[in-house]
């Protein structure tokens, strides 16, 4: 099996626990959350808290496809990610990569998949070790038809920071959240 992913306390990430996804460098903002974007109230985009003191919303990470008995989240394996929160959109909070280019980029959004691909892998993500890391630092990848690094970028209007397929990738750590 590939090695497990670890949280900021050095414990293995588990599919039955909640985590905050934080930037490895807190000077670069806070944790991941949901926000409306590009003039639309719904669906909600995966975005980053501007304030480095804010942890964002907790996520649940689970193996993609079926329910394997292994509850440990491992590097380089397909996972599904969803926020553990309620929204005014009354839609799923599971992440997927949007097929539509918004401001020239593919965003990670929540809610229903608008234009499913034949592979149906819009909600497949991977956690990879950050190459320069001595500690438990990682990068996220969207792995639909092919894997793409995920980074944060700013709305053209200078508003929120969104997560999507872009360079440079966003280096993250996982901090265990209290049970919901």
UniProtKB/Swiss-Prot annotation:
MF annotations from Gene Ontology: alpha-amylase inhibitor activity; serine-type endopeptidase inhibitor activity
One family name in Pfam for this protein: Kunitz_legume
UniProt-listed InterPro entries: Kunitz_inhibitor_STI-like_sf, Prot_inh_Kunz-lg
SMART domains for this protein: STI
Family: Belongs to the protease inhibitor I3 (leguminous Kunitz-type inhibitor) family.
UniProt function note: Inhibitor of endogenous alpha-amylase (wheat also produces an exogenous inhibitor which inactivates alpha-amylase from animal and insect origin). This inhibitor can also inhibit subtilisin.
Protein name: Endogenous alpha-amylase/subtilisin inhibitor
The organism of origin for this protein: Triticum aestivum
């Amino acid at each position: 099996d590939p090695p497990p992913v670890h949280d900021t306390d050095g414990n293995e990430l588990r599919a039955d626990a909640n985590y905050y996804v934080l930037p490895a460098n807190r000077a670069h903002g806070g944790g991941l959350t949901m926000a409306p974007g590009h003039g639309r109230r719904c669906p909600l985009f995966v975005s980053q808290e501007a304030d480095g003191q804010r942890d964002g919303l907790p996520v649940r990470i689970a193996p993609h496809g079926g329910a394997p008995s292994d509850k440990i989240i491992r590097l380089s394996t397909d996972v599904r990610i969803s926020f553990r929160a309620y929204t005014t959109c009354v839609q799923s909070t599971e992440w997927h990569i949007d097929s539509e280019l918004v401001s020239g980029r593919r965003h990670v959004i929540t809610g229903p998949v608008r234009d499913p691909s034949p592979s149906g892998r819009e909600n497949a993500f991977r956690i990879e070790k950050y190459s320069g890391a001595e500690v438990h630092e990682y990068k996220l990848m969207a792995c639909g038809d092919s894997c793409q690094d995920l980074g944060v970028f700013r709305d053209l209007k200078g508003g929120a920071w969104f997560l999507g397929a872009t360079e440079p990738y966003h280096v993250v750590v996982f901090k265990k959240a209290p049970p919901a």
